[in-house]
Amino acid sequence: MFLGFLLTLTLGGAGILPAADEEPPPEDPLEAALRIAYEGRKRIQEAIRDYTCILTRRERVDGRQMGYETIFVKVRHPLEEQGRVVQPFSVYVRFLRPDRVKGREVIYVEGRNGGKLIVRNGGTRFAHITTSLLPDSPAAMQHTRYPITEIGVLNLTKRLIENGEQERGNENCEAKLVQGAKINGRSCTVVQVAHKVRGEGLAYKTARILIDDELVVPVHYSAYDWPQTEGGKLVLLEEYTYTDLRLNVGLTDRDFDHRNESYLFLKSYSP
């Protein structure tokens, strides 16, 4: 009798146990986005030594909407051996547009040059001036929201993970995942996170992240504030798009040296 009861439960005759082929509940969009971001961070740290790309950005700085800037970027990730840094985090950028900053070059090598940037002014006035600046100094931060030390897809991935983990369990936060988007012809997954109600300390109303499906790295991030008027449009806070990503191109110390013959820094400058 008892054995027959067990068989009834096992076969689902009593309606207690689910069918073996019943589909699991869909993954929470925020958790799915975090899972993708964790995978991306692991891939970047383990498989991507360096890369070049084009960064297109647009930001609101001190309440003022800045125009689009297009920047050629070289990044080399840090490398440690036996607990010692043998290759520091390194960045080189050259501004391509607009004209007011065209030709500006910046180099940053973590732990070198007194922790300072080496900057060639570029643009239409005093273009050839070469100087050193702290990354977070007022002069370096004059027209941007973040220091150059935070540039790149790895830093963007880390920031997305940090923000996503903070939103876990937040009932004021809605997330959704959309497949099939394209950036520069490449297939991407869209992660959108939105806050339903304005609250103190919220950095944005809506954020959109596009993750390259093949590379598993974020290639676009944009964040919007609440409308300034009832029924108005969302206000852009920041927008960053990485295109033409070329991975593991073999960047060397020379790529992050202002004396490189292909750069326009003052070669005699001593930081």
For the regions a language model picked out, list residue spans one by one.
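Bacterial N-terminal signal peptides
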Residues: 2-13
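A short, polar/charged loop/turn motif at coil->beta-strand junctions and beta-hairpin connectors
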Residues: 5, 47, 87, 185-187
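Boundary at the C-terminal end of the N-terminal hydrophobic targeting segment
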Residues: 19-21
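N-terminal mature ectodomain segment of secretory-pathway/periplasmic proteins
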Residues: 31-126
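Gly/Pro-enriched, hydrophobic low-complexity segments
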Residues: 60-62, 97-99, 107, 113-270
